[in-house]
Amino acid sequence: LVGITYTELGSIGSYVSASAAQEAWKAQAVAIHSYLEYHKQYGSSANALIYTPVEDIPSSARSAIRKAVESVKDEVLTYNGSVIDAVWSASAGYNTQTGVYGTCSSLDAWGSDVPYLKSVESPYERQYHEKMRRIIGKDYDYVEYNDSRTGEPYQSADTTHKDLGGFVQYNTLVSNGRSYRYIGQFVSSRYCFDFSTDATGVPCMYYYGFGHGVGMSQCGAVGYAAEEGMGYRDILKHYYSGVSIRTVGSGTSSGGGLFGWLRRLLGM
């Protein structure tokens, strides 16, 4: 799980109107609440979540977040009556075979077929990808590069070598029968490839996804809100297939973690 802070989501939302950013914040708040409730019920850890101290959030952003979160703080996502494991990532990937931006299913990412974590389209990723790209050969080390010729297209990229979290550990790129291997834990398990060389002739592979790509895309949520005026409920139901949204009693919220954070933010 890629950790999230409300200020990180806010930095993406700053490129759109305040009303659109609020719908994305609402969607994120409901997803986080659902995720924590799910892991609390099943006794697993949710330590991957990252919280920003309330006092570190600018007052203007704090006010906007407070307004967005207040109305949804008791809502969770359910599937067949049970709260869901509402995972999310910063940005969805790109399917080079279909040419469509979209999320990754839990089956493709982790080998577990979860009915509400299907692959869905997420078209508003491209505008944020430049801000999140990583360059193999600069941001990561490369090894086994034994050919100095440039200008030859890469023919394939083997991304099957992953750790237990689903993140690619290294790639083997093939060009005209020669292999180039790059190592390092990539920050995405599904992404768009763009190949080129730097000024010295070293091949660089750009990729633009960020995170595991399963569940809601934060960039996609902002895009749907800004470009289509989509509300948080429709955003959530798009990214989590077949879910319902229900209100739970305030007694379900513990005093620590996200809920303590929200109480301090909301002045409760």
Language-model features and meaning:
Residues 1-268:
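Conserved, single-site charged/polar hotspot
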